[in-house]
């Protein structure tokens, strides 16, 4: 696959685009845990801040991307980071009523 090829050729995995997004934060929208795990295995930082100081885990929780949230937590994402508004991933999951993500975050140490 093209992503793996680019990573193997030394692509800088934590670069941000003009909108302050990393490859990992963009991968969250695809809800592809294999892509997320690949990026992390090549050094992608699962806690790197993006737009509005949102981590990939906060984005996954806000968007209801359970598979992404799970892969990020397995890859070392911090469950209690806050965004620009002071919300955590758990706050977003609760606000959007994504119960499976709420439970996942709590199981992985999110402060409730």
Language-model segment annotations:
Residues 80-112:
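Leucine-rich solenoid repeat scaffolds
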Residues 1-7, 32-40, 65-73, 99-106:
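Ankyrin repeat structural motif
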Residues 26-32, 59-65, 92-98:
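Ankyrin repeat A-helix N-terminal signature
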Residues 17-21, 25-35:
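Eukaryotic tandem repeat interaction scaffolds
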């Amino acid at each position: 696959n093209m992503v793996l090829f680019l990573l193997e050729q030394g692509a800088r995995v934590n670069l941000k685009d003009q909108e302050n997004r990393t490859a990992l934060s963009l991968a969250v929208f695809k809800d592809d845990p294999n892509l997320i795990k690949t990026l992390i295995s090549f050094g992608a930082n699962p806690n790197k801040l993006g737009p509005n100081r949102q981590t990939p885990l906060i984005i996954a929780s806000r968007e209801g991307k359970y598979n992404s949230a799970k892969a990020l937590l397995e890859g070392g994402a911090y469950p209690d980071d806050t965004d620009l508004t002071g919300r955590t991933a758990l706050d977003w999951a609760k606000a959007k009523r994504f119960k499976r993500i709420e439970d996942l975050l709590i199981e992985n140490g999110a402060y409730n």
